[in-house]
Amino acid sequence: MVLTLLFSAYKLCRFFTMSGPRPGADRLTVPGPDRSGGASPWWAAGGRGSREVSPGVGTEVQGALERSLPELQQALSELKQASAARAVGAGLAEVFQLVEEAWLLPAVGREVAQGLCDAIRLDGGLDLLLRLLQAPELETRVQAARLLEQILVAENRDRVARIGLGVILNLAKEREPVELARSVAGILEHMFKHSEETCQRLVAAGGLDAVLYWCRRTDPALLRHCALALANCALHGGQTVQRCMVEKRAAEWLFPLAFSKEDELLRLHACLAVAVLATNKEVEREVEHSGTLALVEPLVASLDPGRFARCLVDASDTSQGRGPDDLQSLVLLLDSSRLEAQCIGAFYLCAEAAIKSLQGKTKVFSDIGAIQSLKRLVSYSTNGTTSALAKRALRLLGEEVPRRILPCVASWKEAEVQTWLQQIGFSQYCENFREQQVDGDLLLRLTDEELQTDLGMKSSITRKRFFRELTELKTFASYATCDRSNLADWLGSLDPRFRQYTYGLVSCGLDRSLLHRVSEQQLLEDCGIRLGVHRTRILSAAREMLHSPLPCTGGKLSGDTPDVFISYRRNSGSQLASLLKVHLQLHGFSVFIDVEKLEAGKFEDKLIQSVIAARNFVLVLSAGALDKCMQDHDCKDWVHKEIVTALSCGKNIVPIIDGFEWPEPQALPEDMQAVLTFNGIKWSHEYQEATIEKIIRFLQGRPSQDSSAGSDTSLEGATPMGLP
C-alpha cells in the first residue's frame, strides 16, 4: 500500500532527523516521493517541489502528522473494504473528522492538512471518492461530496480536473437536495481556482448555470459557496469567462447575495465577485447596470476587517486564510482603476494580514508584491476607506506607512517634490532636483532628455522606472485648479491611463470644446503624447463627442424613471426584495430599490421622487412588514410614507406576500388602509419562475386594484388583502 510505504519512509527520515543535524546545516532536507531532494518533507511540500520550512514549524508539523497519519491510514483501509452503505458512511465520517481537525490547527494547519490531503490522493482515496459520488445512495453522495470539498488542495484539484470533472458536473445537474448542493457548490468553488482552462470547461458544461440557479435559494452556507464560486470564477477564468458570466447575468444574481442583511461574509464574497467583473473593461458597463457594484464601497466602509478575520479563522474551511496564489489575485485588484476593486481588495488583504500575522507568515505579502501596491494606495488614493484599510494592513505586516501624496501636484513646491522622490525610492537624485529647483509644474512637464542631461539620470532603465512612477502620479493627480472643462475625467473615461496627458493638454490651453480641432502632430509635439495609438483614440473620441451632448442633469431623466419601485421592510424583506429586483430586471423591467447609498439629507426626497416616477409599486409584505406602520399617525415610518405616496399618485400597487399575517384594517392609519383593497400574490421560493410570471401579468395588466374587498377580479392564486 502506497500510504504504508510513505509512512515508513517518513518514520525513517524522522529517526535520522532526531540524531541531530550535520554541522552547518540550518534546514531539514528530506527526499520527496519523486526521489529528488527537497527542503521539507513530502507532506509539507505538497508534491510541488522543495521549499524551506523553519525548524520550529517543521517539528510541529511532523508531530501532528505522526499522530494523524496512522489513524488516516486505518480509516482509509476500512473505507476501502466497506460494502454496506452504513459502513461507508462511518468511514467517510472518520476521514472527514481527521481532515477537519487538521485544518483547524493554529499556525500549522495548512501544512498538516496538506499532508493528509496528499496522503488520501496517493493512497487512492481521491479516486475512491469520485466513485462514491456516483453511488445510488443519496447519503453516500452527500458525505463523499462533503469530504471531497475539504481535501481539494492544489494537487487534488489537478487530479479532479483530469479525471473527475464529469462526475462533479453530473452532481451539479441534480440541483437538489440542499445538503448535496452545499458541498457541490463548495467543490465548484475550489475547482474554479484550478486554471483558466478548467474554468472554461466548467462554464461550458453547466457548472456556472448551477451556481447561478442556487443563488435564488435561502440556505446561508449554500449562498456563501455560490458567492465564493462566482468570485473565483471571475478571478481565475480570464476575460472570456468573465464575458460569459456577464452574458448569463451573474452580476445581477450577485445582487441578492450582496444585499443580504443577515450574513456579512456572504455580502463580502458577493461584492468581491462583482468588483472583479467590473475590472474587465469589455463588460464594465453591463456590470454597472446591474446595480450590484453600488453596494461594494458602502459595505466595506461599514465593516471591520479584524472582525472579518476572526470569522474566517473560526470557520474550518477558511481557518488558514488564503494561499499565495489567491492572495496574488487580490493584489491585482489594488492595481485596478476601479474604486470598488481597490476597496474590496484592500479589505480582504487587511483581513489576510491579520491572519498571517497570527501565523507568523507575513513574508508572503512581500513575495507577491502586495507591500508596494498597499503603499501606493496610501500615497495616492483619494478614498478614505481604501487608504485607511491599506494603512492598517501595512501596520499589521510591520511595514512603514508612507505619507499621503497631496493630489494637487501642479501646485507642489520643491519640498513636496523632494518628499515624493524619497517615497518612490529615488532619494539619490534629490540633490539634483533641488539644484534645478524642480517644482510640481516642472515635474509634470519633465522630458526624458531633461531627466538625462539636466538631472543626471544616466541609466535608461532607471529613467524608465522613474517615468513609470511619474505616470502613476499623473494618473492619480487632481487637476481641478487648471482643468476647467473636466478634461481629466473625460480622458479617464476613455482609458484610466489617459489621465496622465491632462496637464500637457491644459498647459497648451486646450479644453474639451477645442480638442477636436487639434491635429495628431500637435498632440505629439506640443502636448507630449508620444504613443500614436493613444493620440488616435483621443482624437477619435473628441470628434465623436461633437455628435453627442455633454452630460447634464436633464440627460439622466430616463435613468431616473423606473418601471418598478420595490418597497420592503429591511429586517425581514430584503432578500425577497433583492430577488424580485433580479427577476424583474432579467425580464426587461427597470427597477428602483433603496441600497442605502442615498446622499445625506436627500434620503426622503430621493425615495419619494422615485415612487412618483415609477409606473408600478411592488410592496413586499414579509413577516411584520406593517408593524411599524401601526400607530404611526405622523407618517414617520418609511414604508408608511412610500405606501401613502403610491396610493395618492394612483400607482399600480402589487403586494407580494411572504410569511405575512394580515392586520385588522383599523390597526393601520387611515391614510394607508386603502392598500388592503389590492390583491396580493403569495411568493413561492420553490416555484419562483411561475410566481414571477404572475407578478409580470399584474404589472402589465393592472389587475390588482379592487374597489371592494369582496371583488371577484383577483387572479387565481392571488390573495385578497384584508380578508380572512
Curated annotation (Swiss-Prot):
Predominant localisation class: cytoplasm
Gene coding for it: Sarm1
ARM repeats: 60-100, 114-153, 155-193, 196-235, 237-280, 281-314, 315-354, 359-402
Protein name stated in the entry: NAD(+) hydrolase SARM1
UniProt-listed InterPro entries: ARM-like, ARM-type_fold, SAM, SAM/pointed_sf, SARM1, TIR_dom, Toll_tir_struct_dom_sf
Swiss-Prot/TrEMBL catalytic activity: NAD(+) + H2O = ADP-D-ribose + nicotinamide + H(+); NAD(+) = cyclic ADP-beta-D-ribose + nicotinamide + H(+); NADP(+) + H2O = ADP-D-ribose 2'-phosphate + nicotinamide + H(+)
Region span, Disordered: 24-56, 703-724
The keyword Hydrolase belongs to this UniProt entry's keyword annotation: yes
Keyword list, A-Z: Cell projection, Cytoplasm, Differentiation, Hydrolase, Immunity, Innate immunity, Mitochondrion, NAD, Neurogenesis, Phosphoprotein, Repeat, Synapse, Transit peptide
Changes seen on gene knockout: Absence of Sarm1 provides a level of protection against axon degeneration. Genetic deletion blocks Wallerian degeneration of sciatic nerve and cultured superior cervical ganglia and peripheral polyneuropathy induced by vincristine. Severed Sarm1 null axons are able to persist up to 72 hours after axotomy, whereas wild-type axons degenerate within 8 hours. Similarly, axons appear to be protected from degeneration in a sciatic nerve lesion model, lasting up to 14 days compared with 3 days for wild type.
Source organism (scientific name): Mus musculus
PANTHER family: NAD(+) HYDROLASE SARM1, SARM1
Pfam families assigned: SAM_2 (PF07647), TIR_2 (PF13676)
